[in-house]
Amino acid sequence: EPSFRCDYGFNIHTKGFAFINYNCVILDTSPVNIGKGVFIAPGVCIACSGHAIHSSQRAEGIGTSKPITIEDNVWIGANSTVCGGVTIGEGSIIGAGSVVNKDIPEGVIAVGNPCRVLRKITDEDLVKLYHNI
């Protein structure tokens, strides 16, 4: 059984290498644009589609769909959901378990349900490499 699922596939566009881990779902009822260097952790759901709010319209099968853009070098943490109409800015990190229902600017760490900016990513976040000689 495949560990990746999508609605159509032809609406998913990658700009370069992107790593999509196992158990990810992309509901591509509108275009999903994924930048280069993107890391998508296990269990992420990228959902362009939604349902009507009013129950009478849902009963008629009326739904919604909005495109999603994930810019270059984004990391989306495990079991997060990205909702339709959202853009995640270049270099940003989405914390595990987040629900992204609004745009996220570039170069930030954002977490939560709903997802909110925690802080900017700075040079202090660079991994310190030590060499033992």
Question: Where are the regions that the model predicts?
Answer:
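Extended beta-solenoid/beta-helix repeat architectures
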Residues: 87-89, 104
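A generic "structured core" feature
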Residues: 33, 71, 93-95, 99
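Flexible, glycine/small-residue-enriched loop-and-beta-strand segment within the central core
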Residues: 2-87, 113-115, 119-131
